[in-house]
Regions:
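Formylglycine-dependent sulfatase
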Residues: 2-9, 16, 20, 24-475, ...
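Residues forming the ATP-binding cleft of Hanks-type serine/threonine protein kinase domains
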Residues: 487
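A contiguous, mid-protein "functional segment" used to position or interact
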Residues: 500-539
Length: 570
């Protein structure tokens, strides 16, 4: 360049520098484009929402009470047909979702215990990976949430009307309906944080449709004119299942007439019949209670005029239960629609994983039951819908044996974070993204329920479920095995344990059960028995809690324990 005039040398140097800048900048832009955008996660969870009450699952009940907004997630994403919980009760299921570990390892086996918030959890791992985290609604693990940037939680179970919330240690009563309040909390947080460069985890967790199924004021008469079909097993005798015979969660025997069925003491009265927990109604404002009474008084007066007895009374109770339960679901579906609409209207759908699930299954009259707890299908199965347009094909169905144990590993993999070795679940990402068949995902699931003696007096039990068979052992104050062929007996009414036609299958199931207990590090400590006096005392306490209702029921001895009437109870 010595012979080139200085003017030209400067021009050439400028051109070379410009080309170098363009090249470097282009390479930087290409690198930025190659870095995948990590998805947001909107996790919506209800409490006790049965698959039978989600119309995407096609149950006859849901056809009469559809959930069009929840169904949008299934239509635009994946529906899980064989997703199960590890322990069918509120708090323990939530602990499993947070930790990816079975109850005996995360330390939260039963409602009423205190969750060890210091242990590693999904929100903590996501925060470490650069996510914002927020939780609104039902926590039910006692203590304050850890790992969340923002949170505002219901006190304990929460109340439907004018619920109390805890935020940063302060308790505040908020006027309104719990489902609407929690939905709006989630939406408000979205509006403030959706524009952030950081991805986020937002957990919107509802009380509904948990007992005692109080619909929003706008839905009090929603299904009054609808006659819902009761299950074929509504009046089953529970032959071959001692645990089913001794439970306290039969609709027509064990529901409280005031608290659960909202019945008045007599025609023309607005005073409730037996209602051991008055706070659910006492906290309503005068205006709310007036609208409530105007809706229920005509229905209750008609009931008193009918003077129903026996089977007709039992069927009426089933109808009232379903009408209230499904009307309570309606506000949840509306709330889901609001969140989906916001995400869509603000261009957030493509990069957001949307999850709809519940903490476990629930009985809607099957075997005559309400509530959950048992390892039978209605209680064991957890509805699960996941949408992520960027990666999950619309309208797919997943038939692998999955569990709430798998939620945390799945979200971590989608977020590009490492899945900790201590998590016992497996990522479901391949099932979702590549529509994998799931045959090799898991050949059996393990289940263990501990909460006895407690509400509804469902015995402690553990078991294994494969694609076709189920083996369960009820223990503590009884010792009974149950086994079912789900292909031949999907309603689980014929206990085939020790049936000679199934000897080989039974042996294989025992081997599988032993193997899973070894795999999941289950020790003898998990099978300790409750002192008999504690069990008897619990039966006595629940007899007292039932109060006047007890004296109206036949079969009192069967209900309150092992063929013996508890002491001091007449």
């Amino acid at each position: 360049m010595k012979n080139i005039p200085e003017l030209y040398r400067n021009q050439i140097l400028f051109l070379l520098l410009s080309l170098l800048y363009i090249s470097c900048n282009g390479e930087k832009e290409q690198q930025e484009q190659e870095v995948p955008k990590r998805p947001n996660i909107v996790f919506i969870m209800t409490d006790d929402h049965a698959a039978q009450a989600i119309s995407a699952y096609g149950h006859p009940l849901s056809k009469l009470a559809p959930t069009p907004n929840i169904d949008r997630i299934a239509q635009n994403g994946a529906k899980f047909n064989t997703n199960f919980c590890t322990n069918s009760i509120c708090g323990p299921s939530r602990a499993v979702i947070l930790t990816g570990k079975h109850s005996h390892l995360n330390g939260f086996r039963m409602n009423g215990e205190v969750f060890d918030g210091s242990q590693p959890t999904l929100p903590k791992y996501l925060k470490k990976a650069g996510y914002k985290t927020a939780l609104f609604g039902k926590w039910h693990l006692h203590g304050q949430p850890e790992g969340f940037d923002d949170w505002n939680i219901l006190v304990d179970q929460g109340n439907y009307y004018n619920p109390d919330f805890i935020k940063q240690g302060d308790t505040t009563r908020i006027e309104g309906y719990a489902t609407d309040i929690v939905t709006e909390m989630g939406l408000d947080w979205l509006k403030k944080n959706a524009g952030s460069e950081e991805p986020f985890l937002l957990m919107v967790q509802h009380k509904a449709p948990h007992r005692n199924w109080m619909p929003a004021l706008r839905h009090l008469n929603l299904y009054d004119s609808v006659h819902f079909p009761l299950p074929e097993t509504y009046f089953i005798e529970h032959e071959g299942s001692l645990a089913s015979q001794e439970q306290l969660q039969t609709i027509y025997d064990d529901m409280y007439e005031g608290h659960d069925l909202k019945l008045s003491v007599r025609k023309g009265s607005d005073s409730l019949a037996h209602n051991p927990w008055t706070s659910d109604f006492d906290r309503m404002t005068a205006g709310q209670r007036r609208i409530w009474n105007e809706a229920y008084r005509p229905k209750n007066d008609a009931f008193h005029e009918a003077n129903l007895k026996g089977r007709e009374l039992a069927e009426w109770k089933g109808q009232r239960y379903l009408q209230d339960y499904l009307a309570t679901v309606a506000s949840v579906d509306e709330g889901v629609g609001k969140i989906l609409d916001y995400l869509e209207e603000n261009g957030l759908m493509e990069y957001t994983i949307i999850v709809y699930t519940t903490d476990q299954g629930f009985y809607l009259g099957e075997k005559g039951f309400f509530d959950k707890r048992f390892m039978y299908e209605e209680s064991l199965a957890m509805p699960l819908l996941i949408q992520y347009p960027k990666e999950i094909p619309a309208g797919i169905e997943v038939n692998a044996l999955t569990q709430n144990l798998d939620f945390a590993p799945t979200f971590l993999e989608f977020a590009g974070a490492e899945i900790p070795a201590e998590m016992q679940g497996k990522s479901m990402r391949d099932l979702l993204v590549n529509a994998a068949s799931g045959k090799d995902f898991r050949n059996a699931i393990y289940y263990h329920y501990y909460d006895f003696p407690a509400f509804h007096m469902v015995k402690r039990h553990y078991g294994v479920r494969t694609a076709r068979y189920k083996l369960m052992h009820f223990y503590d104050d009884i010792d009974q095995w149950e086994m079912y062929d789900l292909q031949e007996d999907p309603r689980e009414i014929r206990n085939i344990y020790n049936n000679p036609n199934y000897t080989q299958v039974q042996q294989q199931l025992h081997t599988t059960l032993d193997s899973l207990q070894d795999q999941y590090k289950v020790t003898k400590k998990e099978f300790e028995q409750t002192p008999p006096e504690k069990v008897e005392r619990a039966y006595q306490n629940f007899a007292r809690l039932a109060d006047d209702d007890v004296r109206n029921y036949e079969g009192y001895v069967r209900k309150y324990g092992s063929g013996k009437v508890p002491k001091n109870v007449e």
